[in-house]
Curated annotation (Swiss-Prot):
Cytoplasmic topological intervals: 1-8
A Gene Ontology cellular-component term: plasma membrane
One Pfam match: CcmE
Domain of life the protein comes from: Bacteria
SUPFAM superfamilies membership: Heme chaperone CcmE
HAMAP family in the record: CcmE
Encoding gene (name): ccmE
Protein name (database record): Cytochrome c-type biogenesis protein CcmE
Residue numbers binding heme: H120, Y124
């Protein structure tokens, strides 16, 4: 009887340790995806060249058209402002005061976005 209880206890301990190890590996690999985007106040110069997702509101009167498909604008989280350069087609919902998420890299103090995602509330209706 004693040997049977000891074997069960060892099996339970091994299963528990395996589960902890599996959860640790999953959380480590999902680390960069747990937080979908960073606000401008959390961006540091240390993250140069690293792929980032930055989110905030497009600041009023900050949208500057540089070329046909190249624009510059500022996003804010009401703590810090952050300049973004983007080349490409703008999302339909892009406008001043709108929440956006920019995906790209920090280069020389400016954020070069390769993709823009416009955020919307729960009342979104596609254009007709």
């Amino acid at each position: 009887m004693q040997k049977r209880v000891r074997n069960r206890l060892i099996t339970i301990i091994i299963c528990f340790c395996s589960a902890c190890l599996g959860i640790s590996i999953i959380l480590y690999n999902l680390e960069k995806n747990i937080v979908f985007f960073l606000p401008p106040s959390k961006i540091n110069e240390i993250e140069q060249g690293k792929e980032l997702r930055v989110g905030g509101l497009v600041k009023t009167d900050s949208i500057n058209k540089i070329a046909d498909d190249k624009i510059s604008f500022v996003i804010t989280d009401n703590i810090k402002d952050f300049e973004i350069l983007y080349q490409g087609t703008l999302p339909t919902l892009f406008r001043k005061g709108q929440g956006i998420i920019a995906i790209g890299q920090l280069s020389n103090g400016k954020f070069i976005a390769r993709q823009l995602l416009a955020k919307h509330d729960e009342n979104y209706r596609p254009p007709q």
